[in-house]
A protein has these predicted regions:
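The feature captures the beta-strand-to-loop junction immediately N-terminal to the Walker
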Residues: 38-40
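Conserved ABC ATPase "signature" region
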Residues: 102, 117-135
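Conserved switch/coupling elements of ABC/ABC-like ATPase nucleotide-binding domains
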Residues: 212, 216-226
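Catalytic Walker B motif of ABC-type/P-loop ATPase nucleotide-binding domains
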Residues: 164-168
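Conserved ABC transporter NBD signature motif
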Residues: 61-69
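Helix-to-loop junction immediately C-terminal to a conserved catalytic motif
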Residues: 53
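Conserved ABC ATPase signature
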Residues: 113, 139-143, 147
Length: 259
């Protein structure tokens, strides 16, 4: 694996009001890595992800993308280096699915920004990857939540950044679609990396190479095997977990009625 850092933080502190989400975090993401950000509801996964993407200014420290401070990069530079998938998509007006996905090529267009045949081919390929090619002529306003989220992922694929940043990429997806999404992210080209906020610990165990786990005033980071340990999960979620071995995989089950 290339040891080059795509994304890194130096003494990063993130807060909302008086609540400190993380303090003096040193962390790095290398090409080929699939990081999942875990933590209970309201712990600050989305806020941290937005800070890492350059949308929010940190309370302290720096976020670096390819060694440069993310706050000093232009919007076009950022769009080519990192792409962000939000939890939900807010469509202000009607558009075909294909047109929405072609919009991912905007960072590479010049002049009037007319899309080329190559852009359309890339968009259709991305729709095929997320199993939405049959919907290319449909109106995005008429899609289900899960379908719209997969179209947004196709847009991100068409944008083709080095760093894929996703806020709950399996949200609104049925079981089969969750596997499609996670398999796709795991098999991105090796020069790319993924940072995804997730809720499903068992999907994380199956697909992530690394985990960043947020707790109250504490952060655990490292390989998936090292972070996903019952005692660490209990500390982060205030809930005990039972681990069931299933061949080479582990299944994590919260234990009801125990605190």
């Amino acid at each position: 694996m290339n040891a080059e850092k795509l994304l890194s933080t130096e003494q990063l502190s993130v807060s909302v009001g008086h609540k400190v989400l993380c303090s003096r975090l040193d962390w790095q993401v290398a090409p080929g890595q699939f990081w999942c950000v875990l933590g209970r509801n309201g712990i600050g996964k989305t806020t941290l992800l937005h800070t890492l993407a350059g949308l929010n200014r940190p309370a302290g420290g720096r976020v670096l993308i390819q060694g440069e401070d993310i706050q000093s990069a232009s919007a076009q530079q950022l769009a080519r280096l990192r792409g962000l998938l939000a939890q939900q998509q807010a469509d202000a007006f009607s558009s075909s699915v294909l047109a929405a996905v072609i919009a991912g090529r905007h960072p590479y267009q010049f002049g009037f920004g007319w899309d080329m045949e190559e852009d359309r081919a890339l968009a259709m390929r991305a729709l095929e990857q997320v199993r939405m090619a049959a919907f290319s002529a449909h109106d995005v306003m008429h899609l289900s939540g899960g379908e719209r989220q997969r179209v947004a992922l196709a847009t991100l694929l068409t944008q083709d950044p080095l760093l894929f940043m996703l806020d709950e990429p399996t949200a609104h997806q049925d079981a089969a679609a969750q596997i499609v999404v996670m398999e796709l992210l795991r098999h991105l080209p090796p020069q790319k990396a993924v940072v995804a906020a997730c809720h499903d610990i068992n999907l994380v165990e199956r697909y992530a190479s690394h985990v960043l786990l947020l707790g109250d005033g504490q952060v655990w980071q490292g390989s998936t095997d090292s972070v996903l340990q019952p005692e660490i999960l209990q500390a982060a979620f205030s809930c005990p977990f039972e681990v069931v071995e299933n061949g080479s995989r582990r299944l994590f089950m919260p234990i009801a009625g125990v605190s």
